[in-house]
């Protein structure tokens, strides 16, 4: 099948930049959305490389009996794919952080990061001063992937201090191998930001 993004906004999208490292098969989109004459915010959407592990390889991983029996068949392939996936996501993480706007406008970053909260990617996002909307506002288990690997949270909604998260919901609908996330947020007024500093 095909994949891609659609953006629906009642506000004009001022510019559109897509960054794609030639070594990567995925992308980072950065848009500036103008709310009114004075106010804008950035919306960043990204899709990081997955491990590319096949259904057969997932069954191999999930079935402990096969670990010894099928090591030659699947073991080397799985290890190679894991190594490649980690390296690619490290590069994409570094590209994303490098390309983030450096002004003080509200910033939202969302997408399929294909990485867990224990990953290098997740920790680099925290180091960049971003916050995870799930940690801030969710009241449920964080599973966003509905494939055969259970309880994976690999889709994120990151934001900076100029955004206030109001609500976070996972829509339990499986039209894809990921659950949709529905996030409500407010953009903080300048006075609120001044009070916090």
Where are these regions (language model features)?
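A solvent-exposed, charged loop/short amphipathic helix patch at secondary-structure junctions
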Residues: 58-82
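Structured beta-strand-rich core segments of catalytic domains in phosphoester-bond hydrolases
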Residues: 1-60, 169-173
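Metal-dependent phosphoester-hydrolase catalytic domains
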Residues: 32, 98-107, 113-197
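Active-site metal-binding loops of divalent metal-dependent hydrolases
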Residues: 48, 112-113
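His/acidic metal-ligating clusters that form di-metal
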Residues: 44, 85-109
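A broad, low-specificity signal for short, low-complexity segments enriched in glycine/proline
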Residues: 1-7, 67-72, 117-120, 142-147
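Pocket-edge positions in alpha/beta enzyme catalytic cores
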Residues: 81, 85-88, 146
């Amino acid at each position: 099948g095909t994949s891609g993004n659609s953006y629906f906004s009642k506000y004009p999208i001022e510019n559109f930049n897509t960054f794609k490292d030639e070594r990567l098969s995925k992308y980072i989109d950065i848009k500036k959305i103008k709310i009114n004459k004075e106010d804008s915010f950035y919306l960043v959407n990204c899709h990081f490389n997955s491990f590319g592990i096949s259904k057969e390889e997932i069954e191999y991983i999930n079935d402990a009996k096969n670990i010894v029996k099928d090591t030659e068949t699947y073991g080397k392939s799985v290890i190679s794919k894991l190594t490649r996936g980690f390296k690619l996501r490290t590069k994409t993480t570094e590209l994303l952080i490098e390309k983030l706007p450096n002004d003080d406008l509200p910033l939202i970053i969302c997408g399929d990061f294909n990485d867990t909260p224990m990953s290098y990617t997740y920790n680099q996002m925290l180091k960049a001063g971003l916050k995870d909307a799930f940690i801030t506002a969710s009241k449920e288990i964080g599973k966003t992937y509905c494939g055969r690997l259970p309880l994976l949270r690999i889709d994120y909604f990151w934001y900076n201090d100029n955004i206030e998260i109001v609500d976070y919901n996972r829509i339990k609908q499986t039209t894809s191998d990921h659950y949709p996330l529905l996030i409500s947020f407010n953009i903080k007024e300048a006075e609120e930001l001044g009070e916090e500093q």
